[in-house]
């Protein structure tokens, strides 16, 4: 803090006068007055040389400085003398004042020199020791800096105790133990818990709102806590002082409930994590309900996810049978239940109703609406129609009739779509993307997409590189057929078991083929068209699973490579492709019962490298290219056409978001999924799904490796 110039002058003048009168050792004389006169005139108006020095002490001891005199209020007084010299001065001053007071006119003789000198030296030593102690103590804690500026001097200090907060809380804890300075008494049940409002408010938003607002409790010395476990409250009060909690299975729920009331976020998190670690099929429903009641979103979500994942084990426990109807409905309406089929969920509902038929019979109609009855086997629906539990309930009869129509009128299913016709995610299987061309000239990896986790995972690798091959699924196993490795066209076949992740070599085809189409129809697998390295093929081979051999069937009317092949309504369709001169827009189908191929209505555009799939009785053709064989500058297509076999007609639906050649298409659940492809510059890893009801495409989670010409199939594992 600086002072005005006037004050600086006054201070200097006072110091100068003091030094002029009292700075030298006392000169012994029998005449005190002459002593005063000598001291008074000897230095008046003359500078005092070498007497005003600034002293500072560092951590290692006393250090002299030649810096100018400081005038800050917190700084040392300008030009102080050493401690022993100040002692002598003070004694001299005191002695002189005494003489003045005793007799101003006739000075008395002064005490003997030796006695006076000894007293001065002793006093100086004492003061110097005290000064050294004070300086040592100060320099251990303070760092004082002196500026070089004569006009503006500033002293700054910073002091920090690392464990100050911890020491303070320990002191507060001791006050709590001794019941000292407590200013509030919390009453819960049989317990009376003393505490400090400041500590409680610092830890709990609940108490902060209570004690800092104009409410009745803010002025009360005793606060009654309703609806909270006394022991849990006491534990949380102790936690406010110590930060320590004991978590036990038998008290964790009461502790979490109290923490939710007091809005102790950290305690809520640790208690929730403790319960999450205890999740089991026998208790997950109880923890789920508790998390919902307490508003613990994280605990509720984790417990619900665990219940969905382990549903088959959960329904075997008592907690499931004791659930109220509204909780059962929350479970049944979820798409994420991990079950192999809808029939499993139906039997779980009937088990719950059977546990207390008299009281739960009336809830059956409401709960049955959450079961996807159209997806149940028709034999089961026929049995339910005559069951006494269903015949007397009009709502149940209505739902059963809807499901039976879905089975009896398959051609009308597209008009019967509802939430009950949408399969649950776990019942539709998983999507497998196999091989394809990538930036490294061909990938051998297999990726799996799970609807419930919404993610792609690497689950296997082919034994060798294949491009332009085909894949079909028989008995939940993937058959990889033909293709080419570089310029070598293959006729080899391999079988991949997703459960054991084992590859098995199968009998080869009779003809080497790449660019072929592969599909299953009524059991057997067909290899259609392609290129053998020399010419475009119209021949077709059929794999007999029982005989384990390949046989030729009727040939197509037109050679086709990069052809799309799919089965629909007991017929095998071959769509588009290339015949050596140009891309094709024609389509023909094979009837296995007559062993003949027949032409259908053509597409609106010539296309090869298309992706084909069926959904809800329609055939979809996606993407591709339309360049002739001699032109390498293909025009890539984003066009999507839909074929109606009943009317033998084509219609155009919403296009892809980007053009895709050599694209893979496959139905999964209630949507069509388009995977990868080539856009003219990049091997794509993007994925789109098509919603037929809304006629729109939606971007989905991408595959890990961009690929074109991959084969995508669905496998339903038990």
Curated annotation (Swiss-Prot):
* Organismal lineage: Eukaryota, Metazoa, Chordata, Craniata, Vertebrata
List every stretch annotated Disordered.
46-69
Read off the SMART domains from this record: BACK, BTB, Kelch
Gene Ontology CC entries for this record: centriolar satellite; ciliary basal body; cilium; Cul3-RING ubiquitin ligase complex; cytoplasm; microtubule cytoskeleton
Q: Which residues form the BTB domain?
A: 182-249
**Keyword list, A-Z:** Actin-binding, Cytoplasm, Cytoskeleton, Kelch repeat, Repeat
Chief localisation class = cytoplasm
* Name of the protein in its database record: Kelch-like protein 4
Can you say where the Kelch repeats lie in this chain? Answer: 430-476, 477-523, 525-570, 571-617, 619-670, 671-717
The GO biological-process annotations, alphabetized, read as: proteasome-mediated ubiquitin-dependent protein catabolic process
Compartment(s): Cytoplasm, Cytoskeleton
